[in-house]
Amino acid sequence: MEKNWYVVHTYSGYENKVKTNLEKRVESMDMTDKIFRVMVPVEEETEVKNGKSKQVSRKVFPGYVLVEMVMTDDSWYVVRNTPGVTGFVGSAGAGSKPTPLLPEEVDAILRQMGMQEERQVEIDFQLKESVKVKEGPFANFIGTIEEIQLDKRKLKVHVNMFGRETPVELEFTQIEKI
């Protein structure tokens, strides 16, 4: 049996309580080999009230908790009967096993929460290489790559404007090799 991520429906506002309850049940019922992670997806936002900014955590999916588990009768029973859980998302009726999330969906959620590195983009550009700008206000200008910022997916390119070298920040998709 392989482990997958499943979505559990809870009473709205009880997501963290369900997470705590389920983690305690997993420990007490010795299910650590079947139920691995319980997660309430949140994202950090900056909220401005009365001119003051404050960091707040906002639930991405209110009323839902993600559970990484191996689906067996026992693990299914433990999760379903946790206080606050109203059922699994994707089960077609009473007693039927739910459908797991697709790996791409899990990757997107974990990336959104900052828990997984975004897959690196392969770039085929080198410093001091001559390139042509494909789009934007500098379209058709020829320039030289001076800096590559992989984390931002941008490049600093010096283009010749009015007889002077001018630094321009561009995205990878805005340039092409010449």
Curated annotation (Swiss-Prot):
One of the record's GO cellular component terms: cytosol
Pfam family, one: KOW
InterPro entries xrefs: KOW, NGN, NGN-like_dom, NGN_dom_sf, NusG-like, Rib_uL2_dom2, Transcrpt_antiterm_NusG, Transcrpt_antiterm_NusG_bac_CS
A GO biological-process term: regulation of DNA-templated transcription elongation
Location of the KOW domain: 130-159
Keywords on record: Transcription, Transcription antitermination, Transcription regulation, Transcription termination
Function: Participates in transcription elongation, termination and antitermination.
Family of the protein in this entry: Belongs to the NusG family.
This protein's name: Transcription termination/antitermination protein NusG
Source organism of this protein record: Halalkalibacterium halodurans (strain ATCC BAA-125 / DSM 18197 / FERM 7344 / JCM 9153 / C-125) (Bacillus halodurans)
